[in-house]
Design a protein with these regions (language model features):
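Active-site-adjacent substructure of cysteine-protease-like catalytic cores
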Residues: 2-58
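Noncatalytic regulatory segments and standalone regulatory/sensor domains
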Residues: 19, 23, 45-89
Length: 89
């Protein structure tokens, strides 16, 4: 499986990957998804262009579509392996 890391300034590459139906792992900082640090999966885009997530600690957050820019804003600013976004496939 190919995995490519992207930083927040490469958000357009991440959005393009979602448009290609690729999964994206994201390390989040405190905000809507976590109080400390937390991984979520971006599963794709809904019909309105919002992001559908898989949040292992919240079924409720997994059933809501999210604004892509909110996710980018709350993603970790410092992450190893070229993160905080990792595109799978």
């Amino acid at each position: 499986v190919d995995v490519v890391g992207y930083q927040a300034e490469d958000a357009n590459q991440v959005l393009a990957a979602l448009e290609q139906k690729k999964l994206v792992v994201v390390l989040m900082w405190p905000g809507h998804f976590t109080a400390s640090g937390h991984f979520i999966i971006l599963r794709g885009l809904d019909e309105d262009g919002k992001v559908v997530v898989a949040d292992p600690s919240s079924r409720e957050r997994s059933e809501v579509s999210w604004d892509f820019h909110l996710i980018v804003d709350e993603a970790a600013k410092k992450a190893g392996a070229n993160g905080p976004f990792w595109v799978i496939g």
